[in-house]
Amino acid sequence: MKSSILVKLETLVERYEEIQHLLGDPGIIGDQNKFRALSKEYSQLEDITQCFQAYLGAKDDLEAAEEMAKDDDPEMREMAQEEVKESKANILRLEDELQVLLIPKDPNDDRNCFVEIRAGAGGDEAGIFAGDLFRMYSRYAERRGWRIEVINENRSEQGGYKEMIAKVSGDGAYGVLKFESGGHRVQRVPATESQGRVHTSACTVAVMPEVPEAEIPEINTGDLKIDTFRSSGAGGQHVNTTDSAIRITHLPTGIVVECQDERSQHKNKAKAMSVLAARITKAEEEKRHAEEASTRRNLLGSGDRSDRIRTYNYPQGRVSDHRITLTLYRLNEVMEGDMDSLIQPVIQEHQADELAAMAEQN
């Protein structure tokens, strides 16, 4: 392991031990905000500290085994050589774990998120597929014990959605779902196709972290255009006799957010403002990422809607992720929410990308 990485690990362990001492200080215990902040930092450092201590222990075991391998007794030497082999394998495993733990954590990873799905090319079939994607994410959220709530929906006449946005609440929701952003393509025979021809349709997905209330960027009310209108169901049918639905336009960016899910105008406005804050923050992040992308390659793409990330081929029962050339012949399971076999390899590829960038810096 490089000396620069060892120094960094030693510094983190020192900080962990310092916080451990501070958490026993009556002055800190009496200050809830400080105690909460330090407890969170302590928790974040716990895994890497324990892993580094295990690594140092494995290094000591290797040293002792190598010394034992010099023994005159052949039986003792053979046993020591086996221990040397095991210790070296353990050290390599722990080094890999430490490198992953050292990857800078995205501060948004633990947050709730908004998932926005829009039908693209393909007419009615694209709208139906947008509905299928929402169902897939809903099933996946259920498996993870997350809560999913529709914020706004514009239903397609043939089923599914022209566009919709949902909030996913649960531990680590954004960190798991963020790589779903991009273009999703479907290849299948539509129910209305009498000749049995395969059609190609597309949807786009955008995943945005929820911005905590304390961190919501200050939005000048003069920059907002707020319209009210009546909530409508599928096919434009009015389902509410009051103008409870809200449309907010952020004039400087042109971002438009609608919410008509609640009967209360006040609740719809609060939800719309929450989505607007997430979109503005996301737009600022994308601008920063575009600048960073010019300095280093991003293996997983930008997460922009224009990036086609995945194809769902129904006749062949396969789903392919184009960012990591992964193909799985288990489309039915994926569409039922069994998505970890798709999501985890992408997260691992991202980690490998981050490790490569860290190696260049060191």
From Swiss-Prot:
- Which residues, if any, are the signal sequence? none
Gene Ontology CC annotations of this record: cytoplasm
Question: What SMART domains does the annotation carry?
Answer: PCRF (SM00937)
Q: Does the keyword Cell division apply?
A: no
Keywords assigned by UniProt? Cytoplasm, Methylation, Protein biosynthesis
Q: What is its main location?
A: cytoplasm
Report the family membership.
Belongs to the prokaryotic/mitochondrial release factor family.
What name goes with this protein?
Answer: Peptide chain release factor 1
Q: To which species is this protein native? A: Photobacterium profundum (strain SS9)
Phylogenetic lineage: Bacteria, Pseudomonadati, Pseudomonadota, Gammaproteobacteria, Vibrionales
